[in-house]
Regions:
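AlphaC helix of the eukaryotic protein kinase fold
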Residues: 46-64
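Activation-segment/catalytic-loop signature of the eukaryotic protein kinase fold
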Residues: 76
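Conserved short submotifs of the Hanks-type protein kinase catalytic core
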Residues: 80-94
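Activation segment signature within eukaryotic-like protein kinase domains
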Residues: 114-115
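Protein kinase catalytic-loop region centered on the HRD/HxD motif
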Residues: 120-130
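Activation segment of protein kinases
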Residues: 146-189
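C-terminal lobe helix-coil module of Hanks-type protein kinase domains
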Residues: 176-281, 333
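Conserved Walker-type P-loop NTP-binding/catalytic site
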Residues: 373-419
């Protein structure tokens, strides 16, 4: 057992079972009743306000979910300048660790059993109006002996039925870039709902079956572009032993538009159970028409833009021209609520491909007394994106901005304080 320097009143610490960049997890038992527990703490001795909020968020959401498939949360203890989250310990290890410990990946039988259990869990979240937003192998625990599967880490989960992701630098986006749904990037002109978890589950399935992520890159912006616009190689191409219908199921989960994915976890579960039934009876899985039982019980209007193809095309053509070192300015006008913002937001997708920055400003009839209000709004947004870049990138921008502004720099700073 490794030496540990963590103590918490009322608990006997046994060993450390996880060490991440942000959190540490210890195995322990409660002294009062000898109950085995897992204790999660933040690695940072002086955590930021947002880290503390996320820690409380996962306790607040998970404490009321004493349900199969979701880790049970016992208490939130005060620990130094932070918190300690006390959860059940059912002898599980992360799915990531479970697959890494084996020379080969999970068998088809094991994969299907895990997939069916996770479908059940997503159905539970759906019925409780919870969006997890960070489904990945590291957040899925499995008991190596009983094969029981449980979902953990509700730190960025949401109780809202729908969210709008604001445009942010990829380095500070919520979630894990390799598993992020297109709408979670904030660059799809679409809101986030329960179907974002289906995409992340699809990436998880892909990794379990292929032994690799569908998109691999160390460049955050390139990863975003892949999630938004690129199709990964099909699982059947990577490994011919994977039945084509399983490849089809995973591809449907990973559809770019939410309305093209599965619309219910039970529809997904039915298909996986049928695959398992075939495998147990015949030793192989034949192709069949998937998603025949996939019916959502919520009325969801597709977030497509209708009747504005000409205007969107005009904007995209202008963007292609300015990508070749030209400068253009375009103004979009119209009455309130006519859809100006929706049209402008459509330009975000090609901007990611060209590694550009997307900023916008809106002239508001209630802010007519503020000169250049839309320009100020747009450039304050740009400064916010630049400030989350690396020090090296910031240095380049600092040099360029100082050269361009010269003696006028102080004047601009008074208008845009972030500068």
């Amino acid at each position: 057992m490794a030496s540990i320097n963590f103590t918490l009143t009322g608990y006997q610490i046994l060993d450390r079972i996880y060490s991440g960049t942000r959190t540490l997890v210890y195995r322990a038992f409660r002294i009062d009743d000898k109950q085995p527990v897992a204790i999660k703490v933040l690695r940072n001795n002086y955590p930021s306000f947002s880290e503390l909020v996320q820690f409380r968020n996962q306790y607040t959401i998970a404490k009321n979910l004493n349900l199969p498939g979701i880790i049970e949360t016992y208490s939130l203890e005060t620990y130094h300048n932070s918190y300690a989250l006390v959860m059940e310990d059912f002898g599980g290890i992360s799915l990531k660790e479970w697959t890494e410990e084996r020379e080969t990946g999970p068998s088809l039988m094991e994969f299907l059993q895990v997939g069916i259990d996770l479908s059940d869990t997503l159905d539970i979240l759906y019925r409780h109006r919870i969006i997890h937003k960070d489904i990945k192998p590291a957040n899925i625990l499995i008991n190596p002996h009983t094969k029981q599967v449980k979902l953990i880490d509700f730190s960025i989960a949401s109780l809202l039925p729908r969210e709008t992701q604001t445009l942010m630098n990829p380095n500070v986006l919520e979630g894990t870039l390799g598993y992020l749904s297109p709408e979670q990037t904030g660059r799809m002109n679409r809101g986030i709902d329960y179907r974002t978890d289906f995409y992340s589950l699809g990436v998880t399935f892909y990794q379990l079956l292929a032994g690799q992520l569908p998109f691999q890159s160390n460049d955050a912006m390139e990863l975003l572009h892949c999630h938004i616009a690129k199709q990964p190689p099909s699982l059947h191409q990577i490994n011919p032993e994977i039945p084509p219908v399983l490849s089809e199921i995973v591809s449907k989960l990973m559809a770019k538009n939410a309305e093209d994915r599965y619309q219910s976890a039970l529809g997904l579960k039915f298909d996986l159970e049928y695959c398992l039934e075939q495998l147990e009876e015949n030793g192989r899985i034949k192709s069949f028409a998937i998603a025949q039982r996939d019916v959502g019980d919520r009325f969801t209007i597709p977030e497509k833009l209708y009747g504005r193809e000409t205007e969107v095309e005009t904007l995209l053509e202008a963007f292609d021209r300015v990508s070749s070192d030209r400068t253009e300015m375009m103004l979009v006008g119209g009455f309130s609520g006519i859809g100006k913002t929706a049209i402008v937001n459509e330009v975000q997708k090609p901007i990611v491909r060209q590694r550009g920055y997307f900023i916008k400003g809106k002239f508001d009839k209630f802010n007519r007394n503020i000169p250049f209000s839309a320009f100020v709004q747009a450039f304050r947004d740009l400064m916010g994106q630049l400030l989350s870049e690396s020090d090296e990138e910031l240095k380049k921008w600092q040099t360029q901005i100082l050269q361009a502004l010269g003696d006028n720099a102080q004047v601009i700073i008074e208008v845009i304080p972030e500068l």
